[in-house]
A protein has these predicted regions:
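Substrate-binding cleft of secreted/luminal carbohydrate-active enzymes
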Residues: 224-225, 229-247, 264-333
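C-terminal tail/sorting-segment detector
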Residues: 426-429, 443-445, 484-508
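Recognizes extended acidic, P/S/T-rich segments that occur
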Residues: 364-398
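Pro/Thr/Ser/Gly-rich low-complexity, intrinsically disordered linker/stalk tracts
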Residues: 313-361, 411-427
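Catalytic domains of carbohydrate-active enzymes, especially glycoside hydrolases
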Residues: 20-46, 145-150
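Active-site-adjacent "subsite" loops/lids of carbohydrate-active enzymes
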Residues: 1-19, 73-78, 88-145
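Aromatic-lined carbohydrate-recognition surfaces of secreted/lumenal glycan-active proteins
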Residues: 86-98, 152-153, 171-217, 263-272
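Beta-strand-rich modules
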Residues: 395-414
Length: 508
């Protein structure tokens, strides 16, 4: 509700306008190489999807409790996945809004014991056992009903204005109880869904650098590094809205205590605004360079300042993210790689195609390219398309490039690479010849090299669209199920190189 939407959905046309606003944002994020989107899904005990527990937030329709006429979470998931980006449902955990607001009023009717009032604001009480179960209910509802890639917990801590009367150790145990309840609820359902949070940007005081009283571990009882160590969380987005000595030592601390999990520090790019702290771009760009050196990602808060190109941050990121990047694999959850794709071919109009794997789980594909063979998929600079859900991608107009494709499962684990063959390793007597076909059987051409290789036959129409693929078995190919017309025959080598054998005509 902060950066989107900018208009209310109250009629069919306004629904379309609201959707177009989100699409425009996602298009810009995709162009800049963003691979994860955190979408605020539970706002203040209110939601952007139809929930059995909590009312609609008013940011979509303009009226709290009123449906906008569509499921915003489902729409956003589809649009992110279409662009090769993960979508994580951002769940604000403890704050529930104004005491008399729609979300808090609903909770007061359900279970007043879970709530604590501070001024005119309401909060779920982390010290009450029911709180952990209730937030887990919300997260389970999202994971069961939506194809999210992650659950992201915001404000999973004691509020700064809460008079904490328990010991810090007890306080951390209460917050961790909530985290564990969510973990134990969602992981049996979809173990590949990442559980993450946005802790305070400084975990604790360091030996040489102080947090000046504002840290995750002691001040607000977040044992975030412990959550990584104990396997309760897969990823952290520490809110590192600082600079200089308040940033770099603490970023290194997060890196050194990641326990093999993913750490993606959040950068306070809103401070670039003249209305905020008017930071120069160099503060953020330097932080991005250092984070990359330490193998950490970066997240931007907020997206509006990014897509508005405040102080040139968007333009800088376009150059900084010169090639796509993959989210690190969840090897601690599963290290089993999917089978590699087959039948890699570069067709007309520079469209690279491959045969998708038949599998019970969701599989994505990553495409790599380089001027040398084989393509080195360990070099991130060779990645040209990530998390492709289909089996085709348009590549650059260059006959000097080689390509490779990997399959990737929901854990982010990649298969081995299907590589293009070096050019010119198969030959046919006359690739422009008319092949003999009686309308049902196609007589295959002879090439001594083919009989010694594991190749696949590919039949395309005159526009280059695949019509049939088959293993090369014997001296004929069954084309009885193909409609009459003119077709081209190719062989695809085991590494994906396409060689033209000729064309044939089916008449019946």
């Amino acid at each position: 509700g902060i950066d989107w939407p900018h208009s209310y959905a109250q009629t069919p046309s306004s629904i379309d306008r609201q959707k177009r606003e989100l699409v425009a944002i996602l298009d810009k994020l995709q162009k800049a190489g963003i691979n994860q989107v955190l979408l605020q899904t539970r706002i203040r005990a209110t939601t952007i999807y139809p929930s059995v527990y909590e009312p609609w937030d008013g940011c979509l329709s303009g009226r709290p409790g009123k449906s906008p006429g569509y499921d915003a979470l489902a729409f956003a998931i589809d649009e992110c996945h279409r662009r090769g980006m993960e979508l994580h449902a951002w769940v604000v955990a403890i704050p529930v809004g104004k005491w008399n607001g729609a979300g808090c009023r609903n909770l007061r009717k359900r279970n007043l014991k879970m709530l604590k009032r501070i001024g005119d604001e309401g909060f779920l009480n982390p010290e009450m056992p029911q709180t952990a179960g209730y937030i887990a209910d919300i997260c389970e509802e999202i994971v069961r009903n939506y194809d999210v890639d992650g659950i992201h917990l915001d404000y999973i801590r004691y509020p700064e204005n809460w008079n904490i009367k328990v010991t810090p150790t007890q306080g951390r145990s209460f917050i961790t109880r909530i985290v564990k309840a969510i973990h134990d609820r969602i992981k049996p359902i979809k173990p590949y869904v990442k559980l993450s949070s946005a802790p305070i940007g400084k975990h604790d005081d360091l030996t040489r650098y102080q947090s000046y009283g504002w840290n995750a571990y002691r001040r607000v009882c977040q044992d975030a590094q412990g959550w990584l160590r104990d396997g309760l969380m897969d990823q952290l987005f520490p809110m590192m809205y600082f600079q200089g000595r308040q940033f770099f030592p603490f970023a290194i601390d997060w890196s050194e205590n990641s326990y093999g999990r993913i750490v993606t520090p959040g950068l306070g790019i809103y401070f670039l605004s003249p209305k905020e702290k008017d930071w120069p771009l160099e503060i953020i760009s330097r932080e991005m360079h250092v984070l990359r050196q330490y193998g950490l990602g970066h997240a931007f808060f907020r997206s509006k300042f990014f897509t508005d190109n405040t102080k040139g941050i968007y333009d800088f990121t376009l150059k900084h993210n010169a090639s796509p990047a993959l989210v690190p694999p969840m090897t601690w959850a599963s290290s089993t790689a999917p089978a590699a794709p087959t039948c890699l071919a570069l067709g007309r109009n520079h469209v690279l195609t491959w045969q998708k794997m038949v599998t019970g789980g969701d599989i994505y594909y990553n495409v790599y390219s380089s001027p040398s063979h084989p393509v080195d998929i360990t070099d991130g600079r060779n990645l040209i398309a990530a998390r492709v859900s289909g089996n085709a991608v348009r590549v650059g107009n260059s006959d000097r490039m080689y390509y490779a494709v990997t399959a990737m499962n929901r854990y982010g684990v990649e298969s081995g690479a299907l590589q293009m063959e070096p050019r010119g390793d198969l030959s046919f007597t006359n690739p422009s010849a008319t092949l003999s076909c009686d309308g049902r059987k196609l007589i295959l051409p002879h090439s001594q090299e083919v009989w010694e290789r594991n190749v696949v036959l590919l039949v395309t129409d005159v526009q280059g669209n695949p019509v049939l693929t088959s293993a090369w078995k014997g001296q004929t190919l069954d084309v009885s199920k193909i409609a009459p017309g003119v077709y081209h025959l190719y062989v695809l080598t085991s590494r994906g190189v396409r060689h033209r054998c000729g064309y044939f005509v089916i008449r019946r």
